[in-house]
Amino acid sequence: MEAAAGGRGCFQPHPGLQKTLEQFHLSSMSSLGGPAAFSARWAQEAYKKESAKEAGAAAVPAPVPAATEPPPVLHLPAIQPPPPVLPGPFFMPSDRSTERCETVLEGETISCFVVGGEKRLCLPQILNSVLRDFSLQQINAVCDELHIYCSRCTADQLEILKVMGILPFSAPSCGLITKTDAERLCNALLYGGAYPPPCKKELAASLALGLELSERSVRVYHECFGKCKGLLVPELYSSPSAACIQCLDCRLMYPPHKFVVHSHKALENRTCHWGFDSANWRAYILLSQDYTGKEEQARLGRCLDDVKEKFDYGNKYKRRVPRVSSEPPASIRPKTDDTSSQSPAPSEKDKPSSWLRTLAGSSNKSLGCVHPRQRLSAFRPWSPAVSASEKELSPHLPALIRDSFYSYKSFETAVAPNVALAPPAQQKVVSSPPCAAAVSRAPEPLATCTQPRKRKLTVDTPGAPETLAPVAAPEEDKDSEAEVEVESREEFTSSLSSLSSPSFTSSSSAKDLGSPGARALPSAVPDAAAPADAPSGLEAELEHLRQALEGGLDTKEAKEKFLHEVVKMRVKQEEKLSAALQAKRSLHQELEFLRVAKKEKLREATEAKRNLRKEIERLRAENEKKMKEANESRLRLKRELEQARQARVCDKGCEAGRLRAKYSAQIEDLQVKLQHAEADREQLRADLLREREAREHLEKVVKELQEQLWPRARPEAAGSEGAAELEP
């Protein structure tokens, strides 16, 4: 215990691990996942404190034992040397791709860059087109809720966006958002996860129950962004954007590419999503697990495959080919010739056809390619059992490649389109129309099953049982309808695909003539005529095989075994030829891709050069206009300055005369005013004289009046004085 405690006390985290954690902590601050939400430093400190306490408790001395016992020896733990410092983790340089491409988001074309396999969309273009009806506050709130973080583009990417006219030349920076986060953001803002307004429970329950119980609906689900279950109605899928899936939570109808983003449960906001594209909904929508082990699982699976194949113009979706054993069962042994007229048992009908179907369906394993439909969904957990089973089956299954690798025939050689393959135990003759007449002899089904669907060698089979005649007629009708559908689909696909493999018709026709079926059919029917366009070597080989089968091999089992060996040899030759053709097609496709990429880059460079030339012309015109205006203003100011200088010189010469004239005018005015004042003074003097004369005359008159009145006044005054004296 003490040793363990001591060893625990001296433990230190691995230097390489500690360095990795520190680098992750520093780099996560600027990563796309936002700021680091967890730091390992507090955990290390807590662990150090706990280990220090345990080491202190272990260092306490033990009690002294009895004298009979020897003193205990304290065994200290050996000091372990520090582990060697390992080199740090290998960090790949960040992908700074500057190759601009375009993608479609909610019907709008958005420019983007492919960085690390994920498309980074131009955020300003999304805000101005798809989310133009929402404010920045709403968008930021949804981004915080969904934990969506955007990155900034590099200087080269910003320059490309400016040159292409997507951003103005004055833009200082630009944000980039991944295609997955853009799908989540647009779905949350445009459609939201709100439930519809409540309605009557009885009506809603009856409608939902009626749709669920209907045989025309299929229960499906997806595991993207929190999972969602729904009901698929194949009849409603009439266009690529038709609403044909009903959500079991909100009872609303959605198109397939909208249903894979729709969810009402946990939105997986703290999950790092990568590589999601709603256009790949065919890989995300899966059949409900409620059908596991039920009878209708195969039928509903075929129905779902039919829906996924509709409107698949890019021919990206392929049916799942069932994985069965490549070796024929040990119990498959044809009956003797005397019982050939009797109708074989149902088990004997199924076993040869299943083995031949296995031989035909093994083309998927020829070049190590994995069918897109066989790959697990990007949002489902990976199971190692699947890869183990694939590895076990792959070395035993022979390869049988037909026509072009990029066509549907490479995955469905012996199966008509729109006809799903059932499990091996439940296979019937009807599921494979070309194998309908394959129950009488072993060579005949091999010839009909492995024969390509475009060119068929129509021969008479005299040894065929009469009991199969009513079954073969409707099967031939179905086969003809399937041929028409195959040819129309192939023409439409070839018209849409610009990177189709070269010389498709020639290679397919050449392989049709060299297929095992074409070789085995004359061996079963000796009276049949060889095709007119077959080469002489093929006829000789067929004749040699016919003689070997008829002469050297007596029993049917020996013939079947020999034919099986021949088919295996032929399959190996076909595999080598197919590998060579595939390599040639790959080289052609790569060359075409390089040519298209070079043409696109040249076009972009030419367009950028044209835009730069236009920008230079515009700047030159603006500069010329500004220079012209500057010259005109300079000349105008020069003229004004010259006029001012001349006016100043003229003022200096005429200043004295101007002052003299001014003063003379003032003197004249003053003289005039003085003359007026003199005239006024003379007039006033005359007026004063007249007034004096008038006053003197008046005084004279007054005196005369006084003299006339004066004598009367004296007696009256004397009388008044005497009366006054008498009164006292």
Swiss-Prot record:
Posttranslational mods: Ubiquitinated by ARK2C, promoting proteasomal degradation, leading to enhance the BMP-Smad signaling.
A GO molecular-function annotation: protein kinase binding
Keywords for the protein's UniProt record, in alphabetical order: Coiled coil, Craniosynostosis, Disease variant, Nucleus, Phosphoprotein, Proto-oncogene, Repeat, Ubl conjugation
Record PTM Phosphoserine, positions in chain: S383, S432, S480, S720
Compartments in which it is found: Nucleus
Keyword Protein biosynthesis: no
Alphabetized InterPro entries for the sequence: c-SKI_SMAD4-bd_dom (IPR014890), DHD_Ski (IPR047315), DNA-bd_dom_put_sf (IPR009061), SAND-like_dom_sf (IPR010919), SKI/SNO/DAC (IPR003380), Ski_DNA-bd_sf (IPR037000), Tscrpt_reg_SKI_SnoN (IPR023216)
Ranges of Low complexity composition bias in the record: 493-509, 518-539
Pfam families with a match to the protein in the record: c-SKI_SMAD_bind, Ski_Sno_DHD
Primary localization: nucleus
Residue ranges with Acidic residues bias: 474-485
Chain residue ranges for the region called Disordered: 321-357, 452-542
Gene Ontology CC annotation, any one: nucleus
UniProt entry tagged with the keyword Ubl conjugation: yes
Coiled-coil segments on the chain, per record: 536-710
GO biological process, one term: anterior/posterior axis specification
Cited SMART domains: c-SKI_SMAD_bind (SM01046)
Subunit structure: Interacts with SMAD2, SMAD3 and SMAD4. Interacts with HIPK2. Part of a complex with HIPK2 and SMAD1/2/3. Interacts with PRDM16 and SMAD3; the interaction with PRDM16 promotes the recruitment SMAD3-HDAC1 complex on the promoter of TGF-beta target genes.
Role of this protein: May play a role in terminal differentiation of skeletal muscle cells but not in the determination of cells to the myogenic lineage. Functions as a repressor of TGF-beta signaling.
Entry's disease: Shprintzen-Goldberg craniosynostosis syndrome: A very rare syndrome characterized by a marfanoid habitus, craniosynostosis, characteristic dysmorphic facial features, skeletal and cardiovascular abnormalities, intellectual disability, developmental delay and learning disabilities.
Protein family according to the UniProt entry: Belongs to the SKI family.
Protein's name in the database: Ski oncogene
Gene symbol of the encoding locus: SKI
